[in-house]
Amino acid sequence: MGPIRARTVVAGVALAVVASLGWTTPAGAVDAAARCAALAGVDIPARVIGLPTTGGEVTDAALVAPSGSGTSAIGEHCEVTAALHPVDPAAPDIRLQVALPTTWNQKALMFGGGGYNGTIPALDGNVPFGPSDAPRPLGRGYATFASDSGHQAPAGFLPTASLYGEFLANDEALRNFSGDALKKTRDAAVFVIDRYYDREEPEQTYFAGGSTGGREALAVAQRWERDFDGVISVYPAFNAATLDLYFGHMTRQLAAPGAFPRPAQQVLLYNAVITACDGLDGLTDGVISNEPACDFDPAVLRCPEGQDAGDACLSDPQITAIRAVSSAVTFPYPLASGETGYPGFPFLSGADMSTPLLGLGTTAPADPMPKTAGYGMQFWDAWVEYAVTRDPGFDSLSLDPLAPGPWEDRISELTALQDVNDTDLRPFAGRGGKLLLLHGTADELVSHRATVEYYEGMVQTMGQRKVDAFARFYLVPGANHANLAAAFAAGWDSLTALDRWVTTGAAPADPVVRDTNPGATRTRPLCEYPAHPRYDGTGSPDDAASFDCGTG
């Protein structure tokens, strides 16, 4: 849960005072420490949760003292930890936390997770692609909440807790991860909020998440349109099982003899792509703004005779693999979710294979899967072993996602469960819900091209006018997955924009995104898809005012 914060010691006498007053006492009439302590041990009835559980309880409640200053300031709040129990006694609990500000703005925000989840996101964190020059949600007075989606990664799991996938072997845990935990967490959190603030529910409730959390943001808009007033979905892995299949395709391509580009060769490729395409947008700034116009041919880096001759060139097997993982794949069998393929990654138009952890890694995929292999390859390995075959000893390299044989039906079944791809959001829009959808064009883990396909599917299903009435889609040139060592680390106050749209009806107008890399001062217009920033050729290249949005 991030840095350890000072906690106010709550005297037992305060707990007794609140217990004697009962739950009808106005929230402001009792000391915050006592009100907070009184939550400990409170039952969360199964009847208040919209999906099956066996109920739960608050396991801990402690008042957290104010901390930080300026935009990093976090006010006093009650931090509540709770557990929701499964129907299947073999399934793990859902563990969740809720932060309840003493000075509350009457609004709530749920954070999404990442990867396979397994930990609770920091309640004092920021929204994905959030601003560095504005307070975080909890610092603004939002009640914030999040969960581990129904399983707990072991402490110290390597290379990161978000790659722990053993829980997938349990059906209820799998359903929770696939979306059910979102509803259960939301209902339990609102129950706690209502209890703490004396029967007062939030006036607005929002959801913000990236990657798996971006999928979760779209899931709540698609499945529980009455529960959230607005969602921020960033680099969403919405078609999760289909993406897993593409990870499998990548894994097999890169495991071929001599196919894996070493880290120095990954950097070689990235630098060559930037050199070739950076100026296509009229400005040489390390960012490829006109990404669709870039189609780099890795053959220009070919080693003599196509043989591996060191890190200054690429062999024929490496060129073949790089082209394969940069290209679309169509699956030659039907998937129950309706997905038909995956569009590939922009490694030949600006994405960096060498991004730490999230890129291709430093070691070729193998069986058993190395902890130094790429994130997507380890993700595939866990999915095959625990969700598909449910055999921890299964060699994931032996399963061909283009010809899965006896596993075809199981894979199709998983796509129906995990792909969150309903493009008809009229129920959500019809009750006033708003959607902000963002993706970086240099994403090395979840392709922005897939998000483009989802958005275009929305337009095809609903019509452009209806989509424009409730949704905005922005592509951010140079931004990658989670702003990790990105050419352009995107920062935009999407929460203020979303809240204004929901509460006043004013849609985002001429938004500006800031590069939040250390020492960076540049800004760019945040252009609605399909436009991208275009430099005017005269103004400061660090000022968004020197750019317009266009498609040429």
Positions of PLM-derived features:
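Secretory targeting and sorting signals
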Residues: 1-29
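Catalytic-loop region of hydrolases
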Residues: 28-107, 119-126, 130-132, 283-288, ...
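Glycine-rich nucleophile elbow surrounding the catalytic serine of serine-hydrolase chemistry
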Residues: 209-219
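Histidine-bearing beta->alpha loop at or near hydrolase active sites
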Residues: 470-485, 517-519
